[in-house]
Amino acid sequence: MVGQRIRYYRKTKGLTQEELAQGICSVSYLSKIEKGDAKSSDEVINLLCERLGISPEDVDENQILEMLNEWYLLMVDRNFEKAEEFLHNMVQPKMKSVIEPNLILRYELFLSRFYMVHHVNPDLEGSYKQLKRTESFFDEMTPDLKFYYLNFLSMYYNIKREYKKALDLLKEAESLYNTKTTGITQSEGAVLFYHLALTYNYLCRVTSVSQYAYKAINIFDKEYNYSRSADCQILLGLSNRRVGQYEQAEFHLKQALKYSTTFKDDFTNGVIYHNLGYVASNQKIHSKALDYYFKSLDAKMKIPNNETKSTIMLIAKEYFLADDKKNAKIWLDKCFEVLDLKLIDDMYYHIITLKYRVENNFEDLVEILSKGVIPYFEKLHMWEFVAEYSEMLADIYFDQSLYKKSSQYYQRANAALKNII
């Protein structure tokens, strides 16, 4: 293990083997020490460690490993406040004396996840910097550390909306997990399956969502981890809605609701009611949709700093679809109260598009659909919205007797729908 430490700290300090070995031992002898192939003398080890500024003494690795894994489990179980407290009171003080490379890499990887999922101030770029620090040691990582690295980097790309990159990393992590030599637990495998289902959901790959969501549920249910099972049920609800299986969608969402209402989980309640409203809206049951949306908003507003603009937007949209323009305008104004106009994202396009529809401003609506909205969602491979907005534009062109343009966008909508498989 001391050889591993010497190699790790030599690389972090930017030293070549020749530079470290100079005046202490031969380069070939140092190479053998780093690989663990040589029976090294204490004197040589002490001199090498002294030059690197590290101690040759081992710490209680099992104790540190257990502590780091306990911290990680708090994050996986979404006990974010406890995870933060544990980091400051336990992890950081003890890590000051740790020099074992694998423990440091584990700590830095887990820290990257902590930055990413922080419940108050997530630091996405801080997380990415942590991951980049560990990247140069990927080839030397143990299989379980490689698994974590791939998982966490995929989470980063999912948040950045680069779903193809995220999926490639998750499939690589799945290959590692399937070798059964990683030391990764079954419950961590379930989290991997959930992230695969989540990423396929972003890409509207309905069949793959079901495949991985059910895999994850089978493990979560065995371990009585009903919170994570509920997350998977929500994904199944979303997928079934996309393909028009509304009864199945409602079934899965209400399965998740059993958990969230029992444990008074307002965050999950907000997500579920939001999606139940969307199911009702797709069926054109406006009063039912609005009832669910208001329940979602009530639940979301019980949590400080929670995201509400997507539900507010859907309330405005539902009033518009119900031909209640007065309330549509009232709720559209509320959308603009929480919308950051400098951030061009999904919500920006959904809300601006709705604004032009409510105002009957077809000139600006055609402009933003053709040049902004549709290309934006195509780039993200978000085919559901590509289909929705392409059909909307096709209908406008049809009403204007621009049949060639109308046909082009109907074809574009159909092509997008074929990607929802």
State where each predicted segment sits.
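Short alpha-helical DNA-recognition segment
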Residues: G14-S31
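C-terminal non-catalytic interaction modules
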Residues: R7, Y348-I421
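DNA major-groove recognition helix of helix-turn-helix/homeodomain DNA-binding modules
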Residues: S41-D58
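Helix-turn-helix repeat elements of alpha-solenoid scaffolds
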Residues: V44, M75-M90, V117-R133, E162-S175, ...
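Tandem amphipathic alpha-helical repeat scaffolds
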Residues: M67-R78, E108-V120, F147-R161, E188-L203, ...
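Amphipathic alpha-helical segments of tetratricopeptide repeats
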Residues: H88-K96, Y128-D139, K171-T182, Y214-N225, ...
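Alpha-solenoid helical repeat architecture
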Residues: I99-L105, E140-Y148, T182-V191, E223-D231, ...
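A short, Lys/Arg-rich alpha-helix, primarily the initiator
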Residues: M1-T12
